[in-house]
């Protein structure tokens, strides 16, 4: 079962997030654009390890990211802490979808802490203001063995 937006907001508050009242929704919390990147070199995913390719951070023009069609990495503006008895998912806000764009993210495991990232696919050029709400974090109760202890723990803090 998914939790209420108030439960998600409390989890983010415990991670140090300063949320605006409008970010708390009935079933989750809106995440904002903290930074946007383009990937500039190949990454590597092998059986024995991984490497994320180099990136270039885009600078907003007068507070706005003017994005052409393509794939970007977005870093969210809020620190996140997934409670140990939950799993997190980030879904795109409907206005993003209605403008031909989407967000892709992986499962956010129980115990993950950090300032997460996702893939922003822009199907047609769009202007996105820095700090704009683009995704919604939802939490669901989950049974599991252990908590997240991977290489991305504490990322971007």
State where each predicted segment sits.
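DUTPase catalytic domain/fold
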Residues: 1-157
């Amino acid at each position: 079962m998914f939790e209420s937006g108030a439960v998600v907001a409390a989890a983010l508050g415990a991670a140090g997030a300063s949320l605006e009242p409008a970010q708390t929704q009935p079933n989750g919390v809106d995440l904002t654009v903290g930074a946007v990147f383009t990937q500039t070199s190949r990454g590597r995913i092998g059986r024995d390890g991984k490497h994320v390719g180099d990136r270039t951070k885009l600078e907003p023009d007068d507070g706005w990211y003017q994005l052409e069609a393509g794939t970007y990495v977005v870093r969210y503006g809020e620190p996140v802490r997934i409670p140990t008895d939950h799993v997190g998912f980030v879904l795109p806000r409907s206005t993003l979808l209605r403008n031909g764009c989407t967000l892709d993210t992986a499962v956010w495991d129980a115990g993950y802490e950090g300032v997460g990232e996702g893939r922003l696919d822009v199907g047609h050029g769009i202007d996105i203001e820095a700090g704009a709400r683009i995704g919604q974090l939802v939490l669901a109760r989950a049974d599991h063995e252990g908590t997240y202890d991977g290489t991305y723990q504490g990322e971007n803090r």
